[in-house]
Amino acid sequence: MLRLPKKGLPRFEQVQDEDTYLENLAIQRNASAFFEKYDRSEIQELLTTALVSWLSAKEDVRSQVDLPCGIMSQMNNVGFSTAILLTPVDPTALLDYREVHQMIRELAIGIYCLNQIPSISLEANYDQSSSCQLPPAYYDTRIGQILINIDYMLKALWHGIYMPKEKRARFSELWRAIMDIDPDGKPQTNKDIFSEFSSAGLTDITKDPDFNEIYDEDVNEDPTYDPNSPEETAVFMKYAENIMLKLTFSTTQIQQYENVFIFETGYWLTNAIKYNQDYLDICTYQRLQQRLYLQKKIIQKHFEKKKDIRRGIGYLKLICFLIPFLLSLKKKMKVPYLSSLLQPFSDDKVKTERELPPFIYGRDFKCQNFHYKENQYFHVHGGIEFDISTPSIENALEDFQKNLEKIRDCAANTFIEDSGYKEYYSIPVMEFHGKSYYVIYFELETFYQQLYKTQWWGAINEIVNNLRLKRLPLTDAQLHEQFKKKLGFKRAMKCKSIPFGMKSAVERGLSAVFHTFSRKTSSSTINVSDEAGYTIFHHAALHNRVSIICQLCNANFKVNQRRFVTFSQGPTPLHLAAQACSLETTVCLLCSKADYTLSEKRGWMPIHFAAFYDNVCIIIALCRKDPSLLEAEATAENQCTPLLLAATSGALDTIQYLFSIGANWRKTDIKGNNIIHLSVLTFHTEVLKYIIKLNIPELPVWKTLVEMLQCESYKRRMMAVMSLEVICLANDQYWRCILDAGTIPALINLLKSSKIKLQCKTVGLLSNISTHKSAVHALVEAGGIPSLINLLVCDEPEVHSRCAVILYDIAQCENKDVIAKYNGIPSLINLLNLNIENVLVNVMNCIRVLCIGNENNQRAVREHKGLPYLIRFLSSDSDVLKAVSSAAIAEVGRDNKEIQDAIAMEGAIPPLVALFKGKQISVQMKGAMAVESLASHNALIQKAFLEKSLTKYLLKLLKAFQIDVKEQGAVALWALAGQTLKQQKYMAEQIGYSFIINMLLSPSAKMQYVGGEAVIALSKDSRMHQNQICEGNGIAPLVRLLRISTIAEGTLLSVIRAVGSICIGVAHTSNPVSQQLVVDENAFPVLIQLLRNHPSPNIKVEVAFSLACIVLGNDVLQKDLHENEGFEYADVLYLLHSTEKDICLRAGYALTLFAFNNRFQQYLILESGIMTISIFERFLESTVETEKAMAAFQIVVLAKVIRDMDHITLSARGVTILVDSLYSVQTSTIVLTGNLIASLAHSRAGIPEAFTTLGTIQRLCYHLYSGIEEVRAACSSALGYLTYNANAFRILLKECRNKPNQFIRIKNNISRDASINPAFLKEFQMQQTLVGLPSLSLEKNGGPSIIPIFKRGKEHRRKLKPKIQPKDSLTLLPPVTNFMGLFKATKKTKDSHNIFSFSSTITSDITNVSRPRIVCLNQLGKHVQKANPEPAEG
């Protein structure tokens, strides 16, 4: 009933008009609707928080609190009616103006009416769901949605699990029924739990393309730490329930000019561990922190990948400023004019989730941060907070002040043109100083009750006051219901005990429950300490329960109350808040006049806790309160500043922030330790790397580390070495800094220490930098070699392994003899007695490198009995040891026939062959390397390998996919081909045309070379093979290689020779088929270009010779070469005057081929330049018989071209020299002479007669009895061609009649392509048939002597029968040389026998040295047998 006043009815002017009445009614209706979204428990939380908040405006002096620093205490002049905010733009995620206005509206209601600022905390429920604990004012708001979405994505990245918002909202309602959750929160279902979650939409977050491989990246730069080791995982999971990741936002800059505010905000990703020091000691904390740091790095790197997240972060940054800004306006009685804002979102658009369903891991989920049992689901925890303190307001920059009117116009005109509904409302943007800023505008009105009019805040306050009387305090039933909902039935029953219930309410953040309990009990009961000495106040600070702290402050509890056990120097609530990153609590306590200068037992103030526990936002709040705290020293222990404590704990974020605000990094603790010393002593290498990047001359990290290496303290030396070991691996250039700092001599001194762990770490560090030549030189100069060799005799295999690696690196830098001088080789060989694989690998690799190109070291390995060890490892059970020993044997025996024979004598060949019967291709590759080395220029070893059918195994390597395996197989095969043409031809036939052509097409220089050599071997004196190569399209690959400009010179030489060899046959006969095919492949232009332009004279002269082979005896091609290709003999003639004898002689040979049996070409040569006998004289007088014979051949053919001597005289001299050469004792001379005589025997008239006159026939017949097949073949060919001369015909027929076996020898040894007079064959057969041959016993007819000089019987022939039978007979010289190499005097050389040297460097494979990045001290003395070097039984 409406009661009228006694003065009667009101006057008309006092009555509200109808419009005002309707407006008030709408306001009251909206206010009532605002509260309809809450259920009873939420209303109770809302009312309690609004009632007790320290942000509520009270006039009671006793309840006054300090204002937060910054804008709330500085803003004075608020005479403006509009506010304009400028904040930087993120162009990749633009904000929406309507969203901004929505948030301003929600903040106005939350701050002005309900005294609540936004935040979120995800709290665990008893059934493993997670409550989205927002301040109740922000339920069902856009701000609440953004907070939940951002925090959920943070937790999703932390756990690697995600469920889309729509699906998780639906699943949140159903999952308990699906799982059949009992009152204790346990699932009773028999269903596959993960399948249910998966079908509901839960997935591995890496399925999202934006996060596809984020957990595959290794962000751990400390090799000493394995975050996924069982020990670290177990420790982490022990404390995981109370570890949380949270985002903290803080305003970093504010500028003001009149009503324009320019601000910037930042955020930090912080981890908080809600344990006090009784449950979590500092050492364990640092272990957890190290793992969390790696997890944070991944999240920070990928968190803002999605546009929605970047936009959400942008809104949260804006909210971070709006909170203190609106609080400041509230203090100045100003409020946003909500009616001027854009239309709000409907209620169904801003619904917030009250809880989140649990997470669960699938078997194949990639994230390894947490380890739960299979099918175990779990809750998530974390939060987002805003710092309501701000930096001091600065005056706006001049650019902003000058453009004030433009800013105001831009802000005011935003919605004038189009105020209708739009999907997206853009915020105007302006540029200042090259940076874009949003221009956000809203109107203000006065914040007080107006006459006759009800304001929106008045209506809400009225409802709050009415509800408070109805809803508070809670009944016992409501208390039980609240506890049961959050904690489960069993624990809810325990909460009937007030102390237990109050503590549970504090830990869970149940403000209304705590308010009710506090009404039921006395202050003394509330303030009682638990068994650890902590009060409710401490627990509230630790768990960041601001509303409960407000209740305690309102009840006049001591804000500086200490933990008390046996002494009163325990931490205050502010200490615990600083430790646990309770940002809101810290600001609340500071404003409640908590003493931030109090120290606990270690002398730490809250600022020290914040620095040590890496809580940047707490440091910001404390330093804004009192900037002097930045350099505050702890009052006990080492008197550390916050910066020094941060270095002690490795709090990198804190260190970076403290440096940015000017903390004094020169300060030291009481022991003189600065930030570098403390980082080293506590092994925080991330901090050291950061300081290195700062590059502050007064903070010399490298110099400091060297000083620590040189000090007396074992700990300081050890920690310095350990830090250097890690740092040198962090950056590819840090090794140089270590070197330049003079670290090497200090490290060498440490090697002389008696501390085995220090020695281990030192050699570990040295092995990480010894891969660089300059570091090796410094090591040698500092006397490191004898120190390292001395360590080889210690008892620790880890030291052996590392020292061997370093010596391996040193040996690669020309220090092989120095290592040998200090008895390095016997020391290394002694280690081969060990049975530890990584040691054996490194030792054998070191021995291998020491022997590369060093005959003395090769002999030393044999002399010190190292060969049996290496050979024994060929039969090891370990593939690695087999491969490494093979590689070592290859270098020990390379180019040293004496050692090769010794290795064979020790029994290396059978186990080497056995390697190829295994399946490991890498082992076979190294075995092939050993085969190549041992067989090179060693006929006996080649024979031994061939007798064991090694060829078929090596051929399998040619089928491998890897190019390096193919080329090693090819090189090994060619090493087995030996130096005789017969053996090479046999090997080429075994390889086959297909493989040879594939080699020529290969990109490998080695393969191309072997392919070229195989073509030479096959085509040499064999028209059949030449034609088959042509038919198999083998010429095109050869010509293609000629066109490659980058081809290796050795390979190019081989290919050029192959092209020539394929066109020339026995006794300088030609093959018109192959000649024409070579020309058809356009080889002429390529060869002419090489002849004229290639820088190497070797290439030029070989091209000239090949051109001569291509046109030999082919007038059409000779004409084509001269007329169409522009070939001139002058291009070859000038090579005759080369200072190199080989080139000069080879050029003469090329011209000889051009002139051979061709008078016209001789004329062209004569016209092209002057050729005198002096060119050949040095060869004709040479002591090298092959040079002399070749020059003699040339002057005979070129007799009419040489101008200064009669051609008859020249021919006679040449023939005489060749005949005399047949009396040589050198095989190569006889073979060459026989072939040259065969060629001259079918040249011009008179030459065969001259040979016959000089007794050539008899001498050639004598050589038919030689034991060397090449000699017999060459002489047989010469005799065959001489039979076309009548006189020679008669003499040879007589020889064959008197010695019946003579004809058989000629027939058996003559080359298939060589020619013999058919008339001679017919005549001999006729005389054999009709006349008969004399008895073999007639000595007077040339028969055998009674006392035989030579064994010529059947038995001898059987022994001479070669095991290698190529398809056609072999003659002449090794095709690799093509006569050229025979013209040098025989001399011993230390160089490789390979004419074309290829690098023998081992590719990256299983034979690499074992170089672990870090020495694990906890593994010293523990060695597991990894390999059995003894052959397996059976």
From Swiss-Prot:
ARM repeats: 732-771, 773-812, 814-852, 855-894, 897-936, 1072-1112
Subcellular location as annotated: Membrane
One protein family per Pfam: Arm
Transmembrane segments: 309-329
Superkingdom, natural source: Eukaryota
ANK repeat spans: 532-561, 569-598, 602-631, 638-667, 671-701
Protein name as catalogued: Ankyrin and armadillo repeat-containing protein
UniProt keyword list: ANK repeat, Membrane, Repeat, Transmembrane, Transmembrane helix
Gene: ANKAR
Keyword Transmembrane helix attributed: yes
Lipid bilayer topology: Single-pass membrane protein
Annotated Gene Ontology cellular component terms: membrane
